[in-house]
Design a protein with these regions (language model features):
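PLD-like (HKD) phosphodiesterase/transphosphatidyltransferase domain
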Residues: 2-85, 166-209
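A sequence-composition feature that detects small, non-aromatic residues
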Residues: 4, 31, 95, 111, ...
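Generic detection of long, well-ordered alpha-helical segments
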Residues: 26-33, 60, 95-99, 155-162
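Surface-exposed beta-strand edges and their flanking turn/coil or helix-capping segments
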Residues: 67, 93, 158-160, 167-168
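HKD-type phospholipase D/PLD-like phosphodiesterase module
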Residues: 87-129
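A short, terminal or domain-edge coil/loop segment
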Residues: 104-111, 134-148, 168-183
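Short flexible/disordered coil segments
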Residues: 114-120, 144-152, 179-195
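HKD (HxKxxxxD) catalytic microenvironment of the phospholipase D
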Residues: 118-161
Length: 209
């Protein structure tokens, strides 16, 4: 299989020697994106088996940032809450927006080899965006709170606040479903495929489908 022999790789990320902590709000989309990338690089390069929990605004896609870290042999896991749009007048083109989101998480599932776990929920859009800094990234060392339009962010290393958000996140997971599951067991994969297809269809297995 030619595809199986392809070596996927990326240039290593730059070094970040310290957390960019500040008591002030971070303003401007460029500054917000920059501090998010710096925090992620710092955490996975200074800690082992890092666990990251996050709930991101639709505008923020971290596919490249995480693939960059995973493909350079950094060991960490990510759990993400995904908001999927309902079919309603409040959410224009919900199917297209949900497919776009799916297209960004599939590469993460493959690059992470099972270390990326996306959980999804559907809810009223206004309820989701009822707070100015409702989105967040939780790491071992800090909490990043992010506005929906990426214009503003706040970073905190308060351990009590980090613990509070982490417990809140775990509570939310109990009401969400795992969107994609990865398995290295070929029999589990085949069984899942067969169970999801019609019993009277013909199954054909090829080395290069």
């Amino acid at each position: 299989n030619t595809l199986a022999s392809v070596d996927f790789s990326m240039f290593p990320p730059p070094k970040v020697n310290s957390l960019p902590l500040t008591d002030s709000l971070i303003n401007g989309e460029y500054a917000v994106r920059s501090i998010i990338r710096s925090v992620l690089i710092y955490e996975v390069s200074h800690h082992t088996d890092v666990e990251i929990q996050m709930f991101l605004p639709e505008k923020l896609d971290l596919t490249i940032e995480f693939m960059e870290l995973w493909l350079n042999e950094n060991h960490f896991s990510v759990s993400e809450l995904l908001y999927l749009h309902r079919v309603s007048t409040l959410s224009p083109n919900p199917a297209r927006r949900n497919l776009k989101k799916l297209g960004s998480i599939i590469p993460l599932c493959l690059a992470s080899r099972g270390s990326y776990k996306p959980y999804y929920f559907t809810e009223n859009q206004h309820a989701v965006t009822a707070s100015p800094l409702i989105y967040y990234i939780i790491t071992p060392s800090c909490l990043l709170q992010i506005s929906e339009d990426l214009s503003t962010a706040r970073i905190s290393d308060n351990t009590e606040l980090i613990s509070y958000y982490r417990n809140f996140f775990q509570t939310k997971l109990q009401n969400c479903d795992l969107l994609i599951q990865c398995s290295s067991n070929i029999m589990e994969v085949l069984q899942e495929y067969i169970a999801g297809t019609s019993p009277d269809t013909m199954q054909v297995f090829m080395s290069q489908p």
